Amino acid sequence: MPRFFINESPSRQAIITGEDSKHITKSLRMKVGESLVLCNGQGMDYHCTISSMDEHQVVVSVNSSVPTISEPSVSVTLYQGLPKSDKMDSVVQKAVEMGVTRIVPMLTQRCVSRPDQKSAQKKVERWQKISFEAAKQCGRGILPPVSPLTDFSAALRQSASESTVLFFYEGGGQSLQQCIDSSCKAYPIFIGPEGGFSEEEVQFALDLGAKKATLGPRILRTETAPVAALAAIMLTTGNMT
C-alpha cells in the first residue's frame, strides 16, 4: 500500500500537497476511494481513504491509526568517521534501512575528507534527504536525523555521558553477544573511517568506559561496517524476526 510522511498527526482527515500529491495523482494514478498510509514520523501510521483530489492536493479520510510495526525496540545512534568520496551516501541509506535512530558524521584523526563549514552543511543537507527517501522506501516510522559534522572527542564525550558506547575496532574486542545488555535500550556505536581509529582514539574511548567490540576476524570497509554492526545488533536484540 502506498505510504507517505506528513508533518502532523491527523484526526479525521488530512490534506496532501506538493510532490507527494503529484506522485499520488500523476505517477501512481490513484483514484478516489483507494487506500494509502500516512505516517507522522513519530511512530504512528494512519490508514486512509482518498476522498477527493485535484491538480493541487489530495484529501484523505482517516480510518484508523496504529503504531508503526517497523521500528526496533532499541535506539541506535551511529557515529560514523567521515569516509572519502560519496561513501557516506551509502552509509546513511543502508543505516536507515537497518533501523538506525540517528546518524552523527564525525571527523577523526585518520579522516581524509575534511570539508569546510559551507561544504559540510551542504553534505549534511544531502544526507538528510537520503535518510528521508530511505525511510519512505523501507517503511520506517520515524525520519532518522543526520546531525552536523562533529569532532570525534566531543562526540565520544557526549555519547559516553548518556550510555555505554560500543566502539568497533578492527584490532579485536568483545563479541556483540557479550556487549549487549538486555536491559539497555539505547546504543551509541562508533565506526572509524578508512584506516580505522588511531591507538590514541581507542585508548581515549576505553578511558571513557566504552566497550571495544568486534565484527569478526575480517576487516570490513568503512561503508560495510555500520551495516554489519546494525544488523548484528538488531539480530541480537530480537529485532530481525
Predicted segment positions?
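N-terminal positively charged helical leader segments and presequences
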Residues: 1-67
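A generic structural signal for short beta-strands and their flanking turns/coil linkers
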Residues: 12, 32-34, 44-46, 56-58, ...
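Glycine/charged-rich beta-loop-alpha catalytic/anionic-binding loops adjacent to active sites
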Residues: 14-16, 73-77, 185-188, 207-215
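Short secondary-structure boundary segments
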Residues: 40, 107, 170-172, 193, ...
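RNA substrate-binding interface of SAM-dependent RNA methyltransferases
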Residues: 63, 69-164
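Active-site/ligand-binding-proximal alpha/beta "capping" segment
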Residues: 159-196, 200-201, 211-213
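Structured adenosyl-cofactor binding patch, chiefly the S-adenosyl-L-methionine
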Residues: 199-241
